[in-house]
Amino acid sequence: MARWPAPPPPPPPPPPLAAPPPPGASAKGPPARKLLFMCTLSLSVTYLCYSLLGGSGSLQFPLALQESPGAAAEPPPSPPPPSLLPTPVRLGAPSQPPAPPPLDNASHGEPPEPPEQPAAPGTDGWGLPSGGGGAQDAWLRTPLAPSEMITAQSALPEREAQESSTTDEDLAGRRAANGSSERGGAVSTPDYGEKKLPQALIIGVKKGGTRALLEAIRVHPDVRAVGVEPHFFDRNYEKGLEWYRNVMPKTLDGQITMEKTPSYFVTNEAPKRIHSMAKDIKLIVVVRNPVTRAISDYTQTLSKKPEIPTFEVLAFKNRTLGLIDASWSAIRIGIYALHLENWLQYFPLSQILFVSGERLIVDPAGEMAKVQDFLGLKRVVTEKHFYFNKTKGFPCLKKPEDSSAPRCLGKSKGRTHPRIDPDVIHRLRKFYKPFNLMFYQMTGQDFQWEQEEGDK
C-alpha cells in the first residue's frame, strides 16, 4: 500500500546573529529560499483578490478563461443601455411590467423616434377620459401588469356608470329629440333635463275646463306638464316632496313645470301645503257658471253610476222648502267665494289667475293669451292652434305646421246633459247669486253668470 509522503520538516530557525563574514565571503542569501517566499506571497494575494470579487456577485470572468486554449479571446461585453435595465422595484409597490425596449431605428437607417408626447387634454395616459384628478384617476393612469389590467378593465364600466350623469332616459330623450317628434298636438320636449317641483298649478275647478286649458298650454315649447292628475296636496301628501318631484317631467332651463289637479281648489289643507312648498308659485283657476258646472258634474257621475238618484233629488235637502243641499259636492264646489277666501290667507291675488271656462270655449286664443302673459311666456299659442268643432261645440287643437286632423278632447267632453227641471235651475241661480257677487268683488272680474242667456 502506498503511503503518504512524510511532511516536510519544519523550517529551521533563523540563524543567530553572527559575526560579519570573513573577508572574501558573499553577502547574498540562498537563492532557492527567496524564490519560494515570493511565489507564496503572490499566490496568496491573487487568491485574496478573487475571493473578494467573487463574494460581491459582480465577478465576470473573461471568455478567454472559459474557452478552449485554442480559441481567440474576445473583449468583455459592454454594459447594457439604461433603457434595457430592469426597472427597480420598491418593496410594497405594485408590480409593473418592464417597458419594452425601444426600436433601434438608427441601426436600420431610419430616423430616431421623437420623444413621447404628453397625453391629450382631458385624457389620461391610457387614452381614457380623465375625471379631473383624484386618487381614482391616478390609479387609472398608472401602467398596470397584465393581471392587474384585467381587473381594471372589468371595474371600469362600473366606475363610468357611477360617474356618468347620462342615463338611459337621457339617451332615449335625445334619440327622440333627433326626430323632433310631436305628440298630441303639443311639442314633445326631449326627455332629458332635470325633474323639478312645479312653478305653476292649475288648481281648479272640476268640470270648469281644466283639461282644455292644460292641453292648450302644453302646446307651448316652454311648458312641461304632467298628463295625469297627481293629487299630491289632497290624497298623496304623506308620500313626500321627493315622490311629487319624481312625478314631474324633466325640464330644461327656461321651461316651466306644471300640473293640474282640480280638487285642490276645494281642499282645505291644499293652500297651506302648497305655500310651504313654494311661496311664489303661480296658481290658475278655471271657473265656470256654478249651475252649469254642477249639472256637468252630475252628468259625469251619472255616466259611471247610472243607478244614482236624479239631479233634482240630490240638489235639495227639502225641495218643498227650497233648501239646497250645499253638502253635496256638485253644489259645494260652485261656492267659489268660500273656497277663494281660504286661498287668500296664504297667497296674494296677484299670484292667482282666474280663467273663464265659457270664454275658453268661444275665444280660446284670447284666454290663452292671458295665461301665457301670467306665466311670463311668449305668446306662442294663438288662434292658429285652434279649430272649432261644431259637432261637439268645443275648440280642438291643431298643428299649424302640417295638415293633420285637429285633435279634440275625449268623448266625455261635450256629452249631452240630462234635462233638468227649470224650477230647480231657477232655485240654484238664486242660491249662487250672493256667492257669485262676492266672488266678483274678490277677484275684480265680472263673469256675468247672472244673465239668463248664460244658463243653458
Curated annotation (Swiss-Prot):
Its EC number is 2.8.2.23. 3'-phosphoadenylyl sulfate binds at residues 207-211, 288, 296, 413-417. It is a single-pass type II membrane protein. The keyword Metal-binding does not apply. The keyword Transmembrane helix applies. Residues 60-456 are lumenal. Glycans are attached at residues 105, 178, 318, 389. Substrate binds at residues 229-235, 260-263, 328-329. The chain crosses the membrane at residues 35-59. Residues 124-135 have a biased composition (Gly residues). Brain-specific. Residues 1-31, 68-139, 154-192 are annotated as: Disordered. Keywords: Disulfide bond, Glycoprotein, Golgi apparatus, Membrane, Signal-anchor, Transferase, Transmembrane, Transmembrane helix. Residues 1-24, 74-85 have a biased composition (Pro residues). Gene3D superfamilies: P-loop containing nucleotide triphosphate hydrolases (3.40.50.300). Disulfide bonds join 396-408. InterPro entries: NST/OST (IPR037359), P-loop_NTPase (IPR027417), Sulfotransferase_dom (IPR000863). GO terms for cellular component: Golgi membrane. It is found in: Golgi apparatus membrane. Sulfotransferase that utilizes 3'-phospho-5'-adenylyl sulfate (PAPS) to catalyze the transfer of a sulfo group to an N-unsubstituted glucosamine linked to a 2-O-sulfo iduronic acid unit on heparan sulfate. Unlike 3-OST-1, does not convert non-anticoagulant heparan sulfate to anticoagulant heparan sulfate. Belongs to the sulfotransferase 1 family. PANTHER family: HEPARAN SULFATE GLUCOSAMINE 3-O-SULFOTRANSFERASE 4, HEPARAN SULFATE SULFOTRANSFERASE. This is Heparan sulfate glucosamine 3-O-sulfotransferase 4. The lineage of its organism: Eukaryota, Metazoa, Chordata, Craniata, Vertebrata.
